[in-house]
Design a protein with these regions (language model features):
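Signature of extracytoplasmic/envelope-associated structural regions
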Residues: 1-224
Length: 224
């Protein structure tokens, strides 16, 4: 997890109107403010990005504003719940849904009074980054409730890995959270059905150092 200062991207969208006409929208100075990876039973792994841009330009032009031709990976695949595993403390844990979120803590409203040039400065980190995870599962044991109630920091932590993989193992996305603190693990009784447990956690920096979250993407493509 490094600094975001000086890092940005340009995105372009072609929005087709009711008359089947192309309308190019170009966005410059882009940064990801927050993100989420999530998946549930019967669903696909999805990524949701909240993005902030410095400038919007409508209409095709020259250079970066020219209508671009999109390119796609040669082996594009979808990852689903079928090839997913969640491991907590080294043991597999069956869940009905899982989510990992990241908030970069950016100040995106750095506006100033200026007669010339841009009136918005680059968004910078104005708060500590926060990484959280949540799981919904059938109530299987008191293990995670005990983590929430633990009297020591060590007792509340567990190493968690989430992995989505295709059957041929050529494509995968893996999220490693080496020091996940269990903050909530409510088990409520609302009827005669199987009890559910909602688990909410926060990723911490490991005591030995390193990143609180690592995302590894594997693909057979020579370039990603």
């Amino acid at each position: 997890v490094g600094t975001l200062k000086g890092k940005s991207f340009t995105a372009q969208f072609n929005r087709v109107d009711a008359g089947a006409g192309d309308n190019v929208f170009t966005y410059e100075g882009g940064k990801v403010d927050s993100w989420e990876l999530s998946c549930a039973v019967d669903g696909l792994l999805t990524a949701n990005l909240s993005m902030d841009f410095a400038k919007e330009t409508i209409g095709a032009g020259a250079g970066v504003y020219a209508k671009a031709t999109p390119t796609y990976p040669t082996s594009l695949v979808l990852l689903s719940f079928v090839g997913a595993t969640v491991t907590i403390g080294g043991s597999a844990f069956d869940v009905t849904s899982a989510s990992v979120k990241g908030d970069n803590g950016l100040k995106t409203d750095r506006y100033g009074i200026r007669a010339t040039g841009t009136t918005k400065n680059e968004p910078l980190e104005a708060d500590m980054r926060e990484f959280t995870a949540s799981f919904n599962a059938e109530f299987q044991s008191v293990a995670h409730a005990q983590r929430v109630a633990a009297a020591t920091a060590a007792g509340a932590l567990a190493s968690v890995t989430l992995k989505w993989q295709t059957p041929d193992t050529l494509h995968s996305v893996q999220v490693d959270l080496p020091a996940l603190r269990f903050d909530e693990g409510a088990v409520n009784i609302d009827g005669p059905g199987i009890l559910d447990q909602a688990i909410n956690c926060k990723a911490l920096t490991p005591a030995a150092g390193g990143s609180p979250v690592t995302i590894t993407v594997v693909t057979p493509d020579a370039t990603a």
